[in-house]
Amino acid sequence: MLLVGRIGKSVGLNGGLKLHLESDFPECLKKGVKVSVAPINAFSCASSFKDYVIHSYEHAKNLLFLETIRTPEKAKELTNLGLFMSEAESKKLCVLKEGEFFYCDLIGLSVVEGNEILGKVIEIQRISQTDYFMVETTRSLVEKGLAKIFLIPYRDFYIQEILLQDKKITTHNAKTLLENS
């Protein structure tokens, strides 16, 4: 399951929910699309997920309506939970442009600079308007006294190329970030 957003407060008398998007693809939130709601940390516990169907989504207001949630009381039960969508459904509904990737496809890729593997991507975080690759450093570099985990901004200055077929991200200047972490 992929995190689409975080559900905020209930809005109005018809069960509206404020949605704080975690996705770059709001076009996936269409009427009739199946989504799941669960605590944000429920990734490993499938029984925590409760399924819903989107009734409507107002992108300008970040307002989500689910088909079976029609009262403020029912909406409040979902406050502070995560809104999830299956990976297959996300990939079916979201059309990527050249150079765009799903976060889930980048997790696990090796981070390489020159001929040296620096580590692998274990998570992607968005801080302000910038995405950061959280990289778990290779054991050999950690044994040399470098940080176990470091962040690389997803910027041209650091990221040369993302090669999904080779399962790697080539970088430049990223080792400097590691050395200064």
From Swiss-Prot:
One of its GO terms (cellular component) is ribosome. It is found in: Cytoplasm. Pfam families: PRC, RimM. GO terms for biological process: ribosomal small subunit biogenesis; rRNA processing. Its main location: cytoplasm. GO terms for molecular function: ribosome binding. Binds ribosomal protein uS19. Belongs to the RimM family. The PRC barrel domain binds ribosomal protein uS19. This is Ribosome maturation factor RimM. It comes from Helicobacter pylori (strain J99 / ATCC 700824) (Campylobacter pylori J99).
